[in-house]
């Protein structure tokens, strides 16, 4: 469960290392975001000499959460960290590599480019 002011790791090589959630895209009174939700975030830590800079406002999609994800078949998936991938306005990732495992639910939400770049899909 990601809410406003939550810090997330970045799971790609876009140049950002840590994000802080500002807003959850969707309805106006939505409190929590889960895997596959798009958020507006600010970059808290960035790699030197990268195209993304600290305090830049960006869009990101959540790919891992510490809170359990329960599937329809009864399987429960929980990750060690909260992580997101930086995306552009069309939903394409800004980085060229994805680090770590991501959930299968992203394919159903039309983030196929992120799924194809990921080394492991759970």
Curated annotation (Swiss-Prot):
Keywords: Chloroplast, Plastid, Ribonucleoprotein, Ribosomal protein, RNA-binding, rRNA-binding
InterPro entries with a match to the protein in the record: Ribosomal_uL14, Ribosomal_uL14_bac-type, Ribosomal_uL14_CS, Ribosomal_uL14_sf
Matches recorded under PROSITE patterns: RIBOSOMAL_L14 (PS00049)
Pfam families: Ribosomal_L14
Transmembrane segments: none
One GO MF term attached to the UniProt entry: structural constituent of ribosome
Keyword Transport: no
NCBIfam families: rplN_bact
PANTHER family, per database record: 50S/60S RIBOSOMAL PROTEIN L14/L23, LARGE RIBOSOMAL SUBUNIT PROTEIN UL14M
Family recorded in the similarity comment: Belongs to the universal ribosomal protein uL14 family.
Protein name: Large ribosomal subunit protein uL14c
Species, as recorded: Populus alba
